[in-house]
């Protein structure tokens, strides 16, 4: 608060505006929700832990103890960091990277996983927005918006479960709340005259040029 007050702000200010608000906003925009940054990785069920893009020494003691236990039980710990300090010093593998280029490396990793189909398709279909239909109507005000239930003649209750997916068994668009067993992750469909595509297909399309070679030129990681 002291730093912000030097600029005469009438607003309440504390360290959270610098160390936590950005994290919360990023998580809300990317995965639809937020939790305190010390939520931590699921090391109890992991065999490989990659730490990157984080102010590692800001983490709490419980995470330090969890990593120690993870390594003792045979887990592999990889640290991606410009300098080998803190957690990087005890990592099984340290990957030096140019500062500020973590995003490019993550895009390249995503490119490989998506194109090699080495990800958990059932998890993506059931627990992410990957199957949710996006309106593909360039020039329209609806272009790029998720197809919601009201667009498909459903009650206009704006809830994530009211977003639509393509049910491969019923061969039609249904609400997420109906919990279809096989929502499509790829394809082009028409619902009430609107062309739609699953969000996952748009993600795959956006990753097309994010090859490891592309990322290497940016990150220095080969």
Where are the model-predicted features located?
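Short acidic, glycine-rich surface-loop motifs adjacent to enzyme active sites
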Residues: 46-57
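Long, well-ordered, tryptophan-enriched scaffold segments
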Residues: 88-222
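Glycine/threonine-rich flexible loop motifs
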Residues: 56-65
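Short, structured coil segments at secondary-structure junctions
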Residues: 7-8, 73, 89-91
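A short helix->loop->beta-strand "cap" motif at the edges of active sites that frequently abuts
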Residues: 69-76
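Anionic-ligand anchoring segments at beta-strand to alpha-helix junctions in alpha/beta enzyme folds, i.e.
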Residues: 1-45
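Short, polar loop motifs at secondary-structure junctions
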Residues: 80-86
